[in-house]
Amino acid sequence: MRSMIRTAASAAAMLVTISASGAAQSDKLAADLVKDIGDLETKVVGLAKALPEAAWAWRPMAGTRSGAEVFQHIAADNYFLPVFLGVSAPEATGVKSDYKTAQAFETRKATRDEIMAELTKSFAHLKQAVLATNPAQFPDPISMFGQTYTRQQVLILTATHLHEHLGQLIAYARSNSIKPPWSD
């Protein structure tokens, strides 16, 4: 997780530079991220609905997450990463600023319906967190996992993390002969 975060954050730093006079760019970045997260939500939730219950338990090999575990991981991190931006996770999740709380949420026993509901709530929380982050503060440094990142890097990390797991879920679906709902 930490190496993925460092890699994504480094890529984000190289790809997007916002100057002090770039407030409009910052506002656009936030709007673009919310749109992207919304598109990701549609696809992730669409795959969750398309996968039959048996496929939720499927994993490509030992030591990898099952489909259900990937969905729970996404929900957990949708709550966890905004904590570093100053947006607390809903109290009922138990997710705080330490990774152990996110892991506890991620590995809790939950039914398919509970996971589906939590996915939807977690995406709403993440989009709200992006919008709650003042674009003027995007360059501000924050500490996460013992590293220093800008708020902007953390915001971009949330989207890159979701894209990574969407790709994983597409592979899981296709390995189970399930065509992603948006795919022709």
Spans of model-derived segments:
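Short, contiguous alpha-helical
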Residues: 34-45, 55-100, 141-184
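Bacterial N-terminal signal peptides that target proteins for export
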Residues: 1-12
